[in-house]
């Protein structure tokens, strides 16, 4: 069965089991009893080329559900934002689906990760079907890259692929500012997450299209983001100097991330 048909059937079959508390008229809110790792929203102040970023998350995981969370603020010049990487995390049991993220490279060698997610309440679990039924709000998690990657490689046992985007420094900085604008917007005007229309990959595509309209078309490879890296390659948003399969093999950082977990040089080591 073709993946898109499987995905559609999954939504139809599981989605028929509408939760008892579901209401089509409920408004999105930032005021709920959130999972601790999703309880604090980031925000940003931008004054010309000066950026202050509040509440950058760093979770220290014992297991996926046992962790300590700390937040710190960062101040830097926009000129310090130099590169951006596209990160793909295929679902273990259905690799045509995936979580996607961005990671911005800074002049000091650090990385600022951006993960667009369903914002879960305490004791709530994610499901594709519930995500289509206004059961989750949307959150932009701004975090230490090690937090975002090792959560997935070590504690969710999923592969992670990190691709350097082909973009000028000016384009990277414009993308970063557009992301921060969205972060601030959601702090004031919460939205529902939607599995098909307002998810990790559609939001990242929206940011890119805001800078250059129609760069990324809405289609199957957005609905099935496990193939979004191949779409990025076809659109020359990733390095096309080598065959895609070679690039993909180089982008796999799972083993490196597990080996470098806890290292102060985590971001450098996974890119070596």
Where are these regions (language model features)?
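Glycine-rich catalytic cores of cysteine/serine-nucleophile enzymes that process amide/ester linkages
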Residues: 51, 56-160
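Regulatory N- and C-terminal appendages and interdomain linkers associated
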Residues: 17-20
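C-terminal motif of bacterial Sec signal peptides marking the signal peptidase cleavage site
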Residues: 13-15
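Activation targets extended, charge/polar-rich intrinsically disordered C-terminal tails
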Residues: 178-272
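Charged, low-complexity helical/coil segments in non-catalytic cytosolic or luminal regions
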Residues: 145-148, 152-177, 187
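Short secondary-structure subsegments characteristic of cysteine-rich extracellular domains
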Residues: 10, 78-81, 226-231
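Sec-dependent signal peptide recognition
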Residues: 2-7
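Membrane-interface segments at or immediately adjacent to transmembrane helices
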Residues: 22-74
């Amino acid at each position: 069965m073709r993946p898109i048909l499987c995905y559609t059937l999954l939504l139809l079959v599981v989605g028929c089991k509408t939760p008892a508390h579901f209401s089509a008229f409920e408004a999105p809110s930032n005021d709920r009893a959130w999972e601790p790792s999703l309880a604090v929203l980031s925000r940003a102040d931008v004054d010309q080329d000066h950026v202050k970023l509040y509440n950058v998350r760093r979770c220290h995981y014992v297991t996926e559900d046992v962790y300590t969370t700390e937040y710190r603020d960062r101040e830097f010049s926009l000129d310090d934002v130099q590169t951006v990487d596209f990160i793909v995390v295929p679902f273990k049991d259905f690799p045509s689906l995936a979580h996607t993220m961005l990671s911005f490279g800074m002049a000091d060698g650090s990385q600022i990760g951006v993960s667009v997610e369903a914002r879960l309440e305490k004791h709530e679990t994610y499901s594709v079907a519930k995500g289509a039924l206004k059961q989750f709000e949307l959150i932009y998690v701004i975090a230490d890259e090690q937090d975002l990657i090792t959560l997935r490689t070590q504690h969710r046992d999923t592969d992670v692929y990190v691709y350097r985007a082909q973009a000028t420094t000016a384009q990277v900085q414009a993308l970063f500012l557009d992301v921060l604008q969205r972060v601030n917007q959601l702090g004031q005007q919460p939205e529902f997450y939607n599995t098909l229309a307002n998810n990790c990959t559609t939001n990242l595509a929206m940011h890119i299209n805001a800078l250059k309209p129609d760069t990324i078309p809405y289609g199957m490879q957005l609905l099935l983001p496990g193939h979004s890296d191949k779409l990025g390659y076809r659109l020359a948003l990733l390095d096309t100097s080598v065959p895609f399969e070679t690039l993909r093999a180089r982008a796999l950082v799972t083993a490196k991330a597990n080996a470098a977990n806890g290292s102060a040089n985590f971001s450098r080591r996974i890119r070596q």
